[in-house]
C-alpha cells in the first residue's frame, strides 16, 4: 500500500485487493455475498465474544490470533475450558488483535489451487491435495498433483469457488 501511495506501479493484484483478501471481516462479507459455504466462525475482539461463540460452537474448533505467520499460536481445542485456557495463554501473541475461531472439520481433505486470472478470466493450472489430514497449518504439509481422492462434484465446486473469488477480488496474476 505504501508503494502504491508513493506512485510506484505494482504489476498484478492491487494492494487494495490484497488487503480485502487479508481482512477477515471483509473477506467473510465477500464469502457471504458469493454464497460460498464455509465452517462456522467467529472473529472475536474480546473475551465476551469468545465466550458467546463457545456457547453455540460445535467443537472442536481451530483458534488462532490474526496477523501471525507460520501457524504460530494456532491450536485445535475440543471444549469450552480449553478455549478459555487458550485465550489466556495466547494473550501476548494476539497483541490486541482479534482471535479467529473456526469450526474444525475432522477427517477433512485439504486442497490447494493454483490459478491465474487477468481480472476477467480464470485459468486453473492445478488442484493439489494435501497428503496429511487437514490440520492447523498447511504451510508445512505435502501435496500431490493430481488429487488422489476428489469427486467430480468437489472438483467443480473448487473451480467455481476459485473463479468467483478471483473475479470478485480483482486478482491479476
Locations of regions flagged by a protein language model:
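Internal nucleotide-binding/catalytic subdomain
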Residues: 56-173
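N-terminal glycine-rich "phosphate-gripper" loop used for MgATP/nucleotide binding
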Residues: 1-4
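A conserved helix-loop-beta module that forms one wall/lid of the active-site cleft
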Residues: 8, 12-74
